């Protein structure tokens, strides 16, 4: 007698590529942009963080918290400081072909709320956030 096979299942949410759920057309800032201009951009576009790029390559990430800590708290002039002076340089990233499961594990292990998505040439192609994951029913917190 032949053994019955289990149910055939299609791809699950965890098998999705991060490219399918990430935010594309991310608002960025160049390394030489003044912090004052950058903050206006963040407020006008209603975003909490901006990837910092140079010629399309990811160089860092800036959050409102970075601006408060490194500019406001230290009493520095936001018109004289550049994005490169405030950005976090060692940014955790993922590749655009990573699975959602890979990204969820990374976010949980590193306690992150957002991860820039890059291609194999280090070009920024998107940003995946805990909100992007929540939309597909995945809670990272």
Q: Would you name each region that the model predicts?
A:
Residues 1-141:
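Tandem CBS (Cystathionine beta-synthase) repeat/Bateman regulatory domains
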């Amino acid at each position: 007698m032949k053994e019955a096979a289990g149910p055939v299942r299609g791809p699950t949410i965890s098998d999705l590529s991060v490219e399918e759920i990430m935010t594309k057309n991310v608002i960025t800032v160049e390394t030489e942009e003044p912090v004052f201009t950058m903050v206006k951009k963040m407020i006008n576009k209603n975003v909490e963080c901006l990837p910092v790029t140079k010629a399309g390559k990811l160089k860092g990430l800036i959050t409102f918290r970075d601006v408060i800590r490194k500019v406001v708290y230290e009493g520095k002039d936001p018109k004289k400081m550049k994005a490169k002076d405030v950005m976090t340089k060692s940014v955790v990233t993922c590749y655009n072909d990573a699975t959602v499961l890979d990204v969820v594990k990374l976010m949980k292990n590193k306690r992150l709320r957002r991860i820039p998505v890059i291609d194999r040439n280090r070009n920024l192609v998107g940003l995946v956030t805990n909100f992007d994951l929540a939309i597909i029913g995945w809670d990272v917190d």
